[in-house]
Every structure is written in structure tokens, then in C-alpha cells.
Amino acid sequence: MPLTGLGLYGGHRGSRWLRNRIKVLKQFVVPSLQAQTNKNFTLWISVRQEDRHDKQVKALKEYFDSIREFETVFTYSGLCFWDDKLSDKVARDRLVTNLHGTIGELMNHIGGVSHVLMTIQPSDDCYKNGVVQGLQGVFREMPELQAVGFLKGYMMNYLTGELAEYNPVTIPPFFTIKFPKEVFIDPLKHLEYTGPYKSHEYIADKLKFGTIQERSFIVGCHGENVSTVFSHPYKGESVSREVLKDFGLKDVPNLKIKVSLRKWLLRKLPHKVQRKLRYVFGERFWNRIYEFLRA
């Protein structure tokens, strides 16, 4: 679980963003993890080195240390998958560096296993309660698979409680990669084993990929998302909140966070317009400044 964004400054988006993301994590994601029928997993939370002593991060670590249902490990070397917001060279160099720093921190938690299953767990999205059990079973029954993912799920407006189908036309970032242990713990082998895939849509081009058709994840929308909003084109039919009981979220209240006027106005625009404005005034502008300073 990356507790950071993508792009410049290691994905740092400010203390307000972090405060709101931690609130989402505690209110929605943690209950869905506690609801897993199989708790034989370790929640790996990756944080930037610069945030190791951040008050909010330290408080969050203490919070997870108090949870006994599953193990949690924090690492402080940044994002450990390909950052497609950066140029290929910068993304590759940064990923190798981050993996070098992270693997050492993870070694004591890996143990004497032959393989490591690494599941993408966003810090604001949720999995159905049988996902851990189901994924481990699929890899036992089909050992030739290198990755398994879900193609469809739900999306939820955490602010209003609205729930709908989520029907992407490409592979969404809800999959598990199976690494041989000796590959997982070697940064260069780790990178090459995954392709590297440069965005979740292309994971099946790099690894032998299996799919699960059952809707088993929730994409959370809360006003602080970088790209996914509740008016997304992949949004399908509205569904009953009854499905939330299978995610450990049946009685979860609506999220209450402060959203800036700028973001409130942005959410009122059509999805395509929102994406264009984010690119023009965000990613493209700051990328040019960043590349100029690096030159």
C-alpha cells in the first residue's frame, strides 16, 4: 500500500492530502482488511524517506501497531512500482533505488517461503472479504500463473454513500503478482520479472495473467482522487448498499472531509474536462519546471 502519490517530489501532495488519505484509510480500507476471512497476509505500507518522522505517519504506525488481526510493516524508501508520471529513465532509476532500500526492510517479514504474493492495495480502495483466501487458492491450483487480477468491481462515493458498478475496459490496478522469493528480494531481478509493466493496463503483456470475473473491489471516490471521480466513464448501474456487507462496510458512515473550493468546482465539470485541466495546470506544468531544474 503506497502512502504517497505518483510523479514529482516522490509523490508528495502535502499534509492536508495526507491527513484526508489517512482518514479514508482508517474509515474504509482498514475495516475491509479486518473483514478478510483469511488473515494470513502482511500489509506493507510504503512511505517516503522524508516522511519517516512526520507526525501523521508516526501516529498511523502506532495505530497499525495496535491492530492484531493482521501484520503490518512500514518501509521508508518510497514507491515500489513503476511511476508512469515520470520519464522512463527517471522512473527506472528511482524504482531500482527504492527497491534496494525497501527489500532490506522487508526481509524479516518474508520468512522461509518459496514465493511471495504481492497484491496491489491502494490506500483508498477496498477488497471483498474473501479475496485473500481466493487468491491464495487460485495460485495453489494454477501454479503456472504469474499474476491474477479482477476485471470488474464497484465504485463508491465515500462522501454520499452512493454505490455503482465499475466496468473498466482495460485491466484495473487490482491484481496480485507471484514472485519466486529469490527474484522478489533482488531489486534488478524484481524489476525485470515484471517486464517492467509501466502501467497496470499492460500487466498481462508481461506476465502469464489469470482473471477472476467476480466483482471483488471497490474504487473509492472522495474528492481527493487524482484521476478517478464518481462521474467516471467506467461507472455502471447503481447498486444496493447491501453489497457492502461483503466488504466489512455495511454500517460505514459517509466520509466527512474538507475539500477545497477549487476541487469542489472541478468535480462539477465533465470527466474529460477535469482530466484536461489536471494535465495542463498540474502534471505538464510542474514536469517542465522539474526537468529544467534537473538539466
Features from the language model and the residues they span:
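Hydrophobic targeting segments
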Residues: 1, 13, 32-33, 41-46
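Short loop/turn segments at strand-loop or loop-helix junctions that form parts
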Residues: 1-11, 47-48, 75-79, 151, ...
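Active-site-proximal specificity loops/subdomain of glycosyltransferases
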Residues: 10-15, 49-117
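Short, acidic, metal-binding catalytic loop of nucleotide-sugar glycosyltransferases
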Residues: 17, 28-40, 62-67
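Well-ordered, non-membrane alpha-helical segments in soluble/globular domains
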Residues: 17-30, 57-59, 97-100, 133-134
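Conserved catalytic core of nucleotide-sugar-dependent glycosyltransferases
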Residues: 86-111, 119, 128-208, 212
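Active-site acidic Asp-centered loop
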Residues: 121-123
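C-terminal catalytic/acceptor-binding lobe
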Residues: 176-295
